[in-house]
UniProtKB/Swiss-Prot annotation:
One of its GO terms (molecular function) is RNA binding. Belongs to the tombusviridae RNA polymerase family. This is RNA-directed RNA polymerase. RNA-dependent RNA polymerase that plays an essential role in the virus replication. It catalyses: RNA(n) + a ribonucleoside 5'-triphosphate = RNA(n+1) + diphosphate. Gene3D superfamilies: 3.30.70.270.
């Protein structure tokens, strides 16, 4: 016990006087000393293999004393180093490096005890089984007997507790090892036959190994007993032995961290201090008192702040909250430090803490977030596995074929096997003493089954089968982002029924009840939007439909093949009403399960390709002319169909800068397709009919969209339904029609208000840009105006910064030369790591990675964070071949990427500033994320279906920063 005061005095008195070079010399010497202490355990354990039985007792005593001395020395040094770190005289990186040996002590003890118990039971069972089999001459019987014995030992090892004491009979046998061996040999000799040669080697090994494990077990018990006594005495006498400490903030922090176990001292006796919440550690300080008049009205609000009354518990709470938030001990990187700092700042701001005290407390708490406490070490000693079943059977997993223990049993004459086991027993598997196991990055998740709806509709007939539904799967590349969890809906009867009920027939009101969609005011489309329709027809002019062969030229790949078959069949039989019937299924899309745990499945309702060919001959030729006509009506580019991300960014910039004091108000029509009424469809159809002069075929094709009949099939059920109106998600005019309706209704809105405005539209996504003085009128009247047309819109918060204008989940970011639209990295870093494309093999996964990386890089070259994200996918991927032509790859990312051709380039500082304005990541956080993606090295191995791969990820990937206002 005399080492503690001297060690403390050394750090207290002499350490500040040392030069930096001498400090590093002392640190290196300490490190070497800790390593030598751990190697002493291994060296003594190696002697067990050579010493005769009569000196086992002496060996056990030596090993026990060595363990006790090692624990005592380590605890003393740990205490001194903790004080040193608190006084800020040592770099935290050096301190963390010196703490590595402490992380492994608990695992070392557990392995010694587990090995001892297992080997002792193996010896007893193996001896009895060997005596029985020795009397049997039949080789088949011996082989089956040993197989049963192996199974019995596996079951025994999986249920044995770690700290089971010796049984009396086993203890008596081990107390006289020479007599045990002689009696066993005599028994085997009496059985006779060749069985002696087959079992002698096994029994000899079992006896030798049992003695080894027994010595290790006894030493561990002695060490634990001495450690408990030592810690107990240290707790009672430390205040008397150590110099008097000043009652300062540092001492408060040290006491609080000891109570929480951060000093890794196991407090086995005595009461612990009550754990205070963060608010209990603060005291309120009123800056401006509240003033109330005689009538009780508050004329002046109180202004106050909170000061830290007890720094120790406050810092302890901050450390605990950070570890709970980030799942234990984060890896000490610059990115993680920035993330933890931001988290702690938000906690202090939420508590209305004084800024000066907040900075002091955060500076003290930050190093401890990256240091293991008692509970952290216990968690870290459990090896991370790819599969949850391995975690549940971690004790049994020590005895599979690959473990050092099993290698010794299988190769008893191998010196390498014995050396590896001794190193494993001493906790020296790795020079770093502790590291997380590498796990595969490929995950497979089963499809999502939503809850069954209770709603019923008279026009929907259900037919459920007593069979299982087909399960879809979604795949993920772990390590790229885990802020959001995504899934995919199964094409099951339950999902189909709910999708039809809540996305076709009913909508939810303010109370969450299912009601019918609101109907527009009768005649409002023909009364208010007649001029808008006439303007479109005037700018487009009279047109003629194209031939079927010309229509095929609009498509390539699988879609062209499908429409070619439809064209051939139309020459044999004309289009009919049966071709207009709907074939409904659940869309296989990536759904965000973090934002909404049980979203309503989205259904796709396509008509026959024959119908699409005939209608497409009329609509495809006039689609872009109608877009240009709408642009002329609005006075600038309005419909963002067919533009690249650079062109969209330029159009939004021009629209935003066309006003002196602009404001952008985004609004999204809630379930736009579902709210399209019969009157809205008829008004939209009148636009096409007037352009083509009301041809009979076009009129008939459009009339079939008014009264719809459909069927939906799944392996466990089928549905028949009828519905009037609505926009069917597979129709040829879904995009064109939505753009016409949205721009027309919004144009009527700004005309009635009499305000100058520009609209950015892409169907149901809208951004209205107008002078800031009009924001109140716009937000007040917008919902009411759209409701008159039968639509419900959700208005977003107005933004006054160009980079924060959100359109189609993208924001404009300046790349150094121009503005380009960038998908939100807070969502896409998680979403782009998921795939509905099957990963049948790791090679298929790497081909998919390369395809996504190439598409993403063509959109984000020269932009912060996402450029390195997609570069990492390209770097670790393989040639994608024809993956991009598959139907599973049909997405907005792919279509946008075909319009851009950006390449990798250095990120400009102006781009980092613009990126911060858009998404809230500071330039330092951007660089930290980029460094993470540059150093990301995936292991293409599988985890079990539905089990996380447990890949350690950068904490910034789970960080959702708020952009500046």
């Amino acid at each position: 016990m005399a080492t503690l005061p001297s060690i403390h005095a050394f750090w207290k008195l002499w350490w500040p006087t040392f030069s930096e070079e001498r400090k590093m010399t002392v640190v290196q010497a300490l490190r070497n000393g800790l390593t030598r202490k751990l190697f002493q355990i291994t060296q003594i354990a190696q002697q067990i293999l050579r010493w005769p039985p009569y000196i086992r007792e002496r060996m056990t005593s030596s090993l026990g004393q060595s363990l006790v001395k090692t624990f005592q020395t380590l605890l003393g040094i740990r205490k001194a180093l903790s004080r040193l770190c608190l006084t800020r005289n040592m770099n935290v990186d050096i301190f963390t490096m010196l703490l590595i040996p402490f992380k492994f002590l608990s695992q070392l003890c557990s392995q010694i005890v587990a090995s001892a118990n297992f080997v002792i039971q193996t010896f007893r069972h193996g001896l009895s089984r060997g005596l029985c089999l020795a009397r049997c001459r039949n080789p088949e019987t011996m082989r089956s007997g040993w197989s049963k014995h192996t199974l019995q030992m596996q079951n025994c090892s999986s249920t044995s507790p770690l700290m089971t004491p010796f049984q009396p009979q086993i203890a008596r046998d081990l107390s006289n090892p020479h007599g045990l061996w002689m009696s066993t040999r005599n028994k085997l000799t009496r059985t006779g036959g060749s069985a002696i040669q087959q079992t002698s080697r096994y029994v000899r090994l079992a006896v030798r190994f049992s003695l080894l494990a027994a010595g290790a077990y006894i030493s561990c018990v002695l060490a634990r007993k001495a450690l408990k006594e030592y810690v107990y005495r240290w707790e009672l006498k430390s205040d008397q032995e150590l110099p008097t400490r000043e009652q300062s903030q540092i001492s408060q922090v040290e006491q609080a961290m000891e109570q929480n176990g951060a000093m890794m001292v196991m407090k086995l006796n005595g009461p612990t201090a009550p754990i205070l919440s963060l608010q209990d550690c603060l005291t309120k300080h009123v800056l401006v008192p509240e003033i109330v008049d005689e009538e009780g009205t508050v004329t002046q609000k109180e202004q106050s702040t909170f000061l830290i009354r007890e720094f120790g518990p406050a810092v302890r709470n901050l450390v605990t909250l950070a570890k709970l938030e980030f799942g234990g001990i984060p890896k000490k990187t610059t990115a993680n430090e920035l993330t933890v700092w931001r988290f702690l700042v938000r906690k202090c701001e939420h508590a209305n803490m004084n800024p000066t005290d907040s900075r002091t407390a955060i500076s003290m708490a930050l190093p401890y977030v990256f240091m293991p406490c008692r509970t952290d070490v216990g968690r870290a000693s459990i090896p991370l596995r790819d599969e949850s079943i391995e975690i549940c059977r971690q004790y049994r997993a020590q005895f599979v074929e690959e473990t050092p223990l099993r290698r010794v049993f299988n190769n008893p004459l191998s010196g390498k096997a014995w050396r590896n086991w001794v190193r494993h027993l001493g906790g020296l598997d790795d020079p770093a003493l502790f590291q997380e196991l590498k796990x595969g990055c490929l995950e497979e998740w089963l499809g999502v089954q939503s809850r069954r709806t209770r709603a019923r509709h008279p026009k929907l007939r259900s037919h459920f089968k007593d069979t299982r539904h087909k399960t879809r799967r979604v795949f993920r590349i772990a390590g790229l982002g885990n802020l959001y969890e995504f899934g995919v809906h199964n094409n099951s009867a339950v999902n189909l029924e709910r999708g039809l009920m809540e996305r076709v027939f009913y909508v939810k009101d303010d109370k969450g009840e299912l009601v019918s969609c609101p109907e527009p005011i009768s005649g409002i489309f023909w009364k208010n939007l007649k001029g808008f329709r006439n303007s479109i027809v005037h700018h487009v002019g009279h047109r003629h439909p194209v031939s079927r062969e010309t229509f095929l030229a609009y498509y390539t790949g699988p879609k062209r093949t499908m429409y070619e078959k439809a064209v051939n069949s139309l020459y044999e039989m004309p289009v009919s009403y049966d071709d207009a019937k709907l074939k409904t299924f659940v869309k296989a899309e990536k759904i965000n399960l973090t934002k909404k745990a049980d979203p309503v499945p989205r259904v796709i309702q396509p008509r026959a390709p024959r119908y699409n060919v005939e209608l497409g001959r009329y609509l495809r030729p006039v689609e872009h002319p109608i877009y240009h006509a709408i642009d002329k009506i609005w006075g600038g580019p309005t419909i963002m169909k067919g533009y690249s991300v650079e062109q969209i960014g330029r159009h939004i910039e021009n629209a935003f800068r066309s006003f002196t004091d602009p404001v952008a108000i985004g609004f999204d029509a809630s379930r736009f397709d579902q709210h399209v009424s019969v009157e809205a469809l008829r008004w939209e159809h009148s636009v096409y009919s007037r352009i083509y002069g009301y041809p009979e075929l076009l009129t008939q094709l459009l009339r079939w969209q008014i009264h719809n009949r459909g069927t939906a099939y799944a392996s466990d059920g089928a549905f028949n339904y009828q519905v009037d109106g609505k926009r069917m998600s597979g129709d040829m005019n879904i995009s064109l029609g939505n753009c016409i309706l949205a721009t027309a209704i919004t144009h009527d809105f700004v005309t009635k208000l009499g305000i100058p405005a520009r609209l950015i539209n892409n169907g149901d996504d809208n951004v209205l840009i107008c002078p800031a003085v009009e924001v109140g009128r716009v937000r007040q009247e917008l919902y009411r105006h759209w409701l008159n047309y039968g639509f419900e819109v959700i208005s977003e918060e107005p933004v006054y910064i160009l980079e924060q204008v959100e359109f189609c989940q993208m924001r404009p970011v300046f790349d150094g030369t121009q503005y380009t639209m960038m998908r939100d990295p807070r969502t896409t870093m998680s979403k782009d790591a998921y795939a509905v494309t099957p990963f049948n093999t790791p090679t298929a996964a790497r081909r998919w990675m390369r395809a996504v990386g190439e598409c993403g890089l063509s959109l984000t070259g020269g932009l912060p964070v996402k450029q390195e994200y997609y570069t990492a996918l390209v770097k670790h991927g393989l040639d994608p071949k024809n993956i991009k032509q598959g139907k599973d790859f049909d997405s907005g990312l792919y279509y946008l990427s075909k319009l851009s051709n950006r390449k990798w380039q250095e990120v400009q500082e102006s781009a980092r500033y613009s990126f911060w304005l858009a998404f809230g990541y500071t330039p330092d956080e951007q660089r930290a994320l980029e460094e993470y993606f540059k150093s990301w090295t995936p292991t293409f191995e599988w985890s079990t279906t539905g089990i996380l791969a447990e890949i350690p990820e950068c904490l910034l990937l789970k960080h959702n920063p708020l952009p500046p206002t």
